Regions:
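Post-signal peptide N-terminal regions of Sec-secreted extracellular proteins
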Residues: 26-151
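Secretory targeting and sorting signals
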Residues: 1-27
Length: 151
């Protein structure tokens, strides 16, 4: 009986994030359209030193599920090259992953994001993300604000 309860508890820890988030939003290493919600805790839109582009790093916290997200917005009319070789998630100041979002082209007027894997963390954990963006060959690092899980 105790064994069955432990197995059920373990299974629920794996299933709950899928129910709460509708599945994981892991799209790395590819860029995709994004719609931010109140679960996104993001840096300011940082002007990139090239061509009407802003970059932003976010940590998404939804109860005990979390992930790092990097966002690039092209406010100009010309396409730009972009990549994010480092999308890092930190738990209480310790890095838990460093993902690579592949090189791509972003057309003028578009915004794209790269979602790193979703992780389950306890409510006591404080999360933040770092993103390293390379746009048109210029690199910049941007840090998200910290966010406590379950808030």
């Amino acid at each position: 009986m105790v064994r069955a309860l432990k197995a059920l508890l373990s299974l629920s820890v794996l299933i709950v994030p899928f129910i709460l988030l509708g599945g994981t939003a892991n799209a790395d290493p590819y860029w995709q359209a994004v719609t931010k919600t109140n679960k996104f805790h993001c840096s300011a839109q940082v002007p990139h030193p090239s061509y009407n582009v802003t970059v932003q790093t976010c940590v998404v916290v939804n109860s005990t599920a979390t992930q790092a997200v990097v966002i690039v917005a092209n406010h100009g009319t010309a396409a730009v090259s972009l990549e994010a070789p480092h999308v890092e998630l930190y738990v209480n100041g310790t890095i838990t992953y460093d993902r690579n979002c592949l090189a791509s082209t972003l057309s003028g007027g578009y915004t794209r994001a790269c979602f790193a894997p979703t992780q389950v963390r306890p409510c006591s954990a404080v999360m933040h993300a770092w993103g390293n963006f390379i746009v048109q060959g210029y690199a910049v690092w941007v840090r998200s604000p910290g966010r406590q899980m379950c808030t």
